[in-house]
Amino acid sequence: MKFYLISLGCPKNLTNSEEFTARLLANGHKMVFEAEKADEIIINTCGFIASAVKEAKDEIRYALELKQKGIVKKVAVTGCLVERFKEEVLKEFPQIDTLFSIAAQEKIEDTLKQKGTVLSPLPSSLYLPPYKMSLTSTHTAYLKVADGCNNRCAYCTIPFIRGNYRSKPMADVVREAKLMIENGVKEISLIAQDTTSYGMDLYGKPNLLGLLEKLLKLKGLGRLRIMYAYPHRMTRELAKLMGATDKIFHYVDIPLQHIADPVLKRMNRHCDATQIRQTLDMLKTEIPDVSLRTNFIVGFPEETKKDFNELKKFVREYEFDNMGVFEYFREKGTAAYAMKQIPAAVKHERAAELVEVQSRVIDKINKRLIGTTLEAISDGENFGRTYKDAPDIDGKVTFTRPVPAGTIFKARVVSAHGYERTVEPLN
């Protein structure tokens, strides 16, 4: 069978795609990179928020149009949209050949032979996948250390989709990282819905620190990057370890979502403004050159003008290197769905205003960056990223001279505009 893959959503979903794609290839199937050349189209969907649902449905319509025209024979759909809205998807798209759950991806070859809906319960544990391939570049990869979430934030659908938090055993994570290194990966990004909770279900308490200590012993390790850290679980011991090694990029992705205490409480974020500030100050003390990335939600139910002004002031004060701004989406099944909603126009206005605040922050950061030396990684001969930039979501840098892809090197910043910078390789 020749198959064409459409993988949507976050890096966690991408790792699922990498695992079942590798299973298919190992069993003699062929992956093609043009939909029109495929026998079957497989769509791994996202269903996290309304915009992701719309994107997934648009891709399903596209695939079914090709099937109707006789260009492809089958269409299979899996992923978070299926977990969350399987009945709705079946009703809207009865022409789908196979609709299958995330758990059913583990036996994808058998699953695709079946017609209709193939559902399996989410596994109670994670383990080293028997097959794995990279759907990104050869020098950077995502390593999922856990799946699911126990935080139960009031706006979030992830626990309904992915289930409770389940860590991958430490030995399996280390083996997977070792395989990545042997295959030429230079940058390993550790991901989960909450990376800093790693191990709490297996070892009785979070143990990301212990995992990092083992990963740092791997021969040939390039760099690690930590994504999706929660502020109330980012410990001083973790920060000290990061600050003491050059094998972990001095970068922390730490989604904060808000800073006003009334909003944080309604969000059920398990921390308050004081704790957030203490965590950020601690990170800056223990890792003086730390680069912080975060996300904020504006227009959350009952967010007042005072709350929003506090958020703007906070963004100006802490000067995040990278920042995502999202308008609150009202999602059925979440605690926030029943709360008093804010008009769409107000949410849109506040999002634009916060983006403008961050734009001015970036201008200030860029002025300080000119002439400084940063660690960088090459994604192609003429472009890449600094340690301040994660794959896919952050900014890019252009090189003044070619550097082989996958090279980690020192570079001097020669110009900077917004999130785009030009650097001069130094070695």
Where are the regions a protein language model picked out?
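Alpha-helix-loop-beta-strand connector modules within alpha/beta enzyme cores
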Residues: 205-223, 276-287, 353-354
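Conserved radical SAM core fold
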Residues: 194-198, 222, 231-234, 247-250, ...
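Proteins enriched for Cys/Gly/acidic motifs involved in redox and nucleic-acid/cofactor modification
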Residues: 1-198, 237-240, 248, 252, ...
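Terminal RNA-binding accessory module
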Residues: 330, 338-427
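Conserved glycine-rich "GG(E/T)P / GGGxP" loop and the immediately following alpha-helix
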Residues: 47-52, 185-210, 214, 218, ...
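Contiguous mid-protein beta-loop-alpha structural module that forms a pocket-lining wall or clamp
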Residues: 303, 317-320
